Every structure is written in C-alpha cells, then in structure tokens.
Amino acid sequence: MLPDLTTLSDFRNALAQAPGADADARAACEDRNGQLTKPPGALGQLEEIAIWYGSWRGTARPEVRAPQVIVFAGNHGVTARGVSAFPAEVTVQMVANFKAGGAAINQLAQLADARMDVHALELDRPTADFTQGPAMSEEDLLAALRTGWNAVDPASDVLVVGEMGIGNTTSAAAICHALYGGEPGDWTGRGTGVDDEGLALKTAVIAEAVALHGSRDGLEVLRCLGGREIAAMAGAIAAARVLRIPVILDGFICCAAAASLARLHDQALDHAVAGHQSAEGGHQALLARLGKAPLLSLGLRLGEGSGAALAIQVLKGALACHSGMATFAEAGVSDG
C-alpha cells in the first residue's frame, strides 16, 4: 500500500524508505538464465532486463500481464517567452485527442495490451514563468506529485509515464542544467521544432532561469523549474518504486523528471530502465548521467510515453525467452 502524502517531507521519506528488489528472485533468475538453451550472454540486453524485471516482481519466471501507461498534461508559463513553435492551446487539444484514442500513444498502448490513463493538471492555470520566479509553490508541487502518486494502479506490473505540455522541453532542459551543470546549450533541443533563432532564444531563457534559481536538491529544482506534468511523472515513478513496480522510462522529459528523484536518493531509479534514446538534444547525455542504457534508438522525439510504450514489446520478448525457453536438461541438449 502507498502511504498518503500530506507534505513534501512525506514524499522524501517514502522514497528513502522504499524497498529494494528481491535478492532471492534475482539469484533464481540468474540461475535459470544460465541453464537456458543458448550460449551465455547470447541474448544480450534481453537477458539483463529479464533478470532485472524478475527481481522486482519477485519471481524467477515473470510475465507482463497488466501494463499501465499514464499520460500527464500541463501548461507552462515560460511559453510566453516564445520558446515553442506551437501555442499553449495545443495541450488542451491533444488531451482531447488522447481521450478520443487518436494519438500515437493510444495505438502503442493498445498494441502492448496496456491500460491507458490521462490526467490533465490545471491546464487553465499554467505554471509561472520561471525566468521571473519559481514555476510552482510548494502546495502546487505537492498537488502535482500526489496526482502522479495516486495515478499508479498497485495491480499493474510495469509502468510507463508520458507527458503532453507545450514548453516542457524548455522546463526539462532547465532541470537538467540545474542538476548537472555544463552549458545550457548542452541540454537544449528543438522541442516542437523551433528554428535556429528559436533555439538560441530557448537556450538563453534556460540560462536566465537557472542563474535565477541556482542548483538545489531534486524537489526544489522540480518546484522552481518544472511543470505540473513533469512533477506528476516524478510522483508516479516514485510510487512505482515504493510498490516495486518496474518502470520503463520514456524520453528526455520523462528522464528529467526521473533525474529529480535520482538527486534525492541514489537508488531511486533502480526499478527503472530506459525505453529508448530520443532525438531531443540532451537525452543521450542525460541517460549517461542516470546510468541507463536505452532499449531502443529510433530517432523518436514525440513524447507522450511513445518510446517507452513501444519498449514494452521488447520487455515482453525478453520475458518470453527467459520464462518460456527450455533448459539444457529439459531439451536434452549438451551444454558443453
């Protein structure tokens, strides 16, 4: 069961006290993997993710039966600075598209036999322009974290979180710049497709915001530079950690949300793998900072949870091999 969150301290404490993976299940998965009818390591990363998944689900022969995809939507005050190629009303329009089943994520979630939920977070009340002050109050941050926290179905067995929010690549890049330093341009991509002039403006806005707020702990960075949908993703990822539900991370924005948790606790993302490496500037460097190797690299930069939802199929393939293959003894094959 998830504890209730009434303060930000509750969130910090729940994450710090979250249980780890099942060591006995991991050992059993490794033992089984060593007996399957293949050369050691021949299935590469598929072997690693099957063992990882089994250790979090507590069984040597795991299966995915109840995947959940959650898409969070929020609007950003920083869009007033001209950092996006699309107007903020597109967020509302895309939420309607999600609910009607017309977006890419709807098709990929359906393909994965995943439950899909959509949560719109106060779209008529954008976050504040974070070049002028914090994006959110502590109350707003807690409310967004709680939305994500409570959105996770405890009966799900793998979680994907996605987002929709015009301006949120600017927010994600600012979070990464605040957490990891470097140059603002290291973390800044074209998002919805800004031109060179727009990219230069976006980079300058990020530099201005981080100079104003500085580098703080994960929740303060999220409060000052994040969006409601980004905070909700962080809340959902943290809830899954407490519930020992494996998570497949999506692209740059999702991983920026995850990075705020990693700053809070070193083991906060042990239950997560990277579904893909997106084409958005900064994602490759962010994955390296998080120590996550992507399962896919297809040049995606859509968001919505699309790359991670597609990676559910990779996970299912890994588990089909791990749980369904015969051992050398069962098949009567010499193991050399």
UniProtKB/Swiss-Prot annotation:
Reactions catalysed, as given in the entry? 5,6-dimethylbenzimidazole + nicotinate beta-D-ribonucleotide = alpha-ribazole 5'-phosphate + nicotinate + H(+)
The positions flagged as active site in the entry are 304 (proton acceptor)
The broad enzyme category this protein falls into is transferase
Q: In which pathway does it act?
A: Nucleoside biosynthesis; alpha-ribazole biosynthesis; alpha-ribazole from 5,6-dimethylbenzimidazole: step 1/2
Question: Which terms in the Gene Ontology molecular function aspect does this entry carry?
Answer: nicotinate-nucleotide-dimethylbenzimidazole phosphoribosyltransferase activity
Database matches in InterPro entries: Nict_dMeBzImd_PRibTrfase, Nict_dMeBzImd_PRibTrfase_bact, Nict_dMeBzImd_PRibTrfase_N, Nict_dMeBzImd_PRibTrfase_sf
UniProtKB keywords = Cobalamin biosynthesis, Glycosyltransferase, Transferase
Q: Choose any GO biological process term that the UniProt entry carries and state it.
A: cobalamin biosynthetic process
Q: CDD domains per the record? A: DMB-PRT_CobT
Enzyme Commission number(s) from the entry: 2.4.2.21
Purpose: Catalyzes the synthesis of alpha-ribazole-5'-phosphate from nicotinate mononucleotide (NAMN) and 5,6-dimethylbenzimidazole (DMB).
What protein family is recorded? Belongs to the CobT family.
Please identify the protein, giving its name as recorded.
Nicotinate-nucleotide--dimethylbenzimidazole phosphoribosyltransferase
Q: Source species, please?
A: Ruegeria sp. (strain TM1040)
